[in-house]
């Protein structure tokens, strides 16, 4: 009965917040939403073997997913040429107020001395309520997973179109509506972190440094942190299994590591970086921003290092610069697929959206809210997937039979 009431409450909150969000989006339909994808690097470090997955079940695996209307992913918002003057004027402004906080997020689950084993931090934008709901009710559910305490936060800035109205009072009105919606969502789920900077692609670096500072202050004893985008699917059981032998007091940052990536000098590119901003021929090694994991010790060290490194407009490259300052090398792992699962040339007919692939991975990037729901149900439903290999192959996260 309690479970039924909780599901009914979640459905009602989803409908109310979704309806309010739809009305506001309709009123602000000319505004553009920021894109939070990572730059495509050139060259990869050699991967290490994937740890075998362990079957696990998250709460409410049988719950019906909410209906998503028009859930086809929208194309990325076009980004104009790099604005030199604006970047140079604002690049040293790195402190913005926290408008919505969750100060008690990491105080355990009521047990004395309780602390999260894993904090999930998801980059999101105000308009992306559907994906936040999908994450909350699937792989990002809070509670105990395989005995580990998991907590969750979403990282947001002020909506890009909130203050762009023709008159000041129109822009301020939209800003007030957005903040009211996010406060209602925060009261319902206690997982929203909102800062006062504009939520744009080039401000993702601000989101990075503000989260590191927040986690160091409000989650000082967290063992591990997973940080990723809202359009990823995470196999939390595999992630916890990978972390089980690791010491949170030792340095660790693991993910889809990109090495020898060269700055893009083409002005039309979203990732265009002029030589005046970065003059070296290649970036330091960095983990793709779609999803990576770090230890509590590395969290605190990064928070300090990133406060001293000059801001850079691409967030995951900036984090690589902070790691370089600490003389830390990110650890590559083949089960972090921040560029999705490539279609094998030898089997063009094979579907890569297959639970038998996903159950052996940790992170897959680039899914819609409906895809996240569907894959979670396929993996954690009452029967589970019927796969040819009951255990993952040792050579990598998956392979195709010849």
Curated annotation (Swiss-Prot):
UniProt KW Flavoprotein keyword: no
GO annotation, cellular component aspect: Golgi membrane
Topology, Lumenal side: 28-402
Topology term for the membrane: Single-pass type II membrane protein
Ranges annotated as spanning the membrane: 11-27
Keyword Membrane set for record: yes
Gene3D superfamilies in alphabetical order: 3.90.550.50
Organism annotation: Homo sapiens (Human)
Cross-referenced InterPro entries: Glyco_trans_31 (IPR002659)
Residue ranges of the region described as Disordered: 32-83
Positions with biased composition (Low complexity): 32-47
Species lineage: Eukaryota, Metazoa, Chordata, Craniata, Vertebrata
Subcellular localization(s) per the UniProt record: Golgi apparatus membrane
Chief place of localization: Golgi
UniProt-listed Pfam families: Galactosyl_T
One of the protein's GO biological processes: poly-N-acetyllactosamine biosynthetic process
This protein's encoding gene: B3GNT9
Family: Belongs to the glycosyltransferase 31 family.
GO MF terms, alphabetically ordered: hexosyltransferase activity; UDP-glycosyltransferase activity
Ranges facing Cytoplasmic side: 1-10
Keywords: Glycosyltransferase, Golgi apparatus, Membrane, Signal-anchor, Transferase, Transmembrane, Transmembrane helix
Record EC number: 2.4.1.-
Protein name per Swiss-Prot or TrEMBL: UDP-GlcNAc:betaGal beta-1,3-N-acetylglucosaminyltransferase 9
